[in-house]
Amino acid sequence: MITRAELLDMLASNAPQGFEAQALGLVPIVVETSGRGERSYDIYSRLLKERLVFMVGEVNDQTANLVVAQLLFLESENPDKDISLYINSPGGSVSAGMAIYDTMQFIKPDVSTLCMGLAASMGAFLLASGAKGKRFALPNSRVMIHQPLGGARGQASDIEIQAREILYLKERLNQLLAQHTGQDVERIARDTDRDNFMSSEDAKAYGLIDQVLLKRP
């Protein structure tokens, strides 16, 4: 039987996104008993067995690697069964978010998205990128869309290159958001010019989600 200390050491090398290693003691451990004895899971690994993936906290390369790996694993387990992506994120890196986005579109299973708490910036983009008819938000969650942020430094030629890149990303994100919401690109460009916060009902009316969930269906 594995000890709790050994389990925490194992988890520290593969911590769930949004949690630092020092906080692992706060992650619940689930013990399942069967005819073959006991087996311990951290709560996120146990929920992964139910095809639930969590994207919590900043969207960065580490978060993207974890989410992408889980999506690919669940596809290999069953390519015909939906995956649920739970989002509570202030956003973050565009490149990391696009890695998650492209994987969501690439794999065979539909990816259902659900906002709990906050889906802002890239978090909102990924929320809207779920399978059509399977994008949800809880009633008191908030959604925020805006244009990509960037800070250019260096020589004038370097700043010019970075400016062209962020303008390209802005246009590309607007096109994709228009595709997923049904809004025209011009409206998306206007509405993302500054931080644009929405209630879950407003997000539904805008086309970012399909339904506000009061209770589990």
From Swiss-Prot:
Catalytic reaction(s) noted: Hydrolysis of proteins to small peptides in the presence of ATP and magnesium. alpha-casein is the usual test substrate. In the absence of ATP, only oligopeptides shorter than five residues are hydrolyzed (such as succinyl-Leu-Tyr-|-NHMec, and Leu-Tyr-Leu-|-Tyr-Trp, in which cleavage of the -Tyr-|-Leu- and -Tyr-|-Trp bonds also occurs)
Catalytic residues as annotated in Swiss-Prot or TrEMBL: S121 (nucleophile), H146
Superkingdom of source: Bacteria
Coiled-coil ranges from the UniProt annotation: none
Entry keywords, A to Z: Cytoplasm, Hydrolase, Protease, Serine protease
GO (cellular component) term, any one: cytoplasm
One GO biological process term: protein quality control for misfolded or incompletely synthesized proteins
Function of the protein: Cleaves peptides in various proteins in a process that requires ATP hydrolysis. Has a chymotrypsin-like activity. Plays a major role in the degradation of misfolded proteins.
Listed PANTHER family: ATP-DEPENDENT CLP PROTEASE PROTEOLYTIC SUBUNIT (PTHR10381:SF70)
Assigned protein family: Belongs to the peptidase S14 family.
NCBIfam families reported in the protein's UniProt record: clpP, PRK00277.1, PRK12553.1
Subunit details: Fourteen ClpP subunits assemble into 2 heptameric rings which stack back to back to give a disk-like structure with a central cavity, resembling the structure of eukaryotic proteasomes.
Name the UniProt record assigns to this protein: ATP-dependent Clp protease proteolytic subunit
Organism field: Burkholderia lata (strain ATCC 17760 / DSM 23089 / LMG 22485 / NCIMB 9086 / R18194 / 383)
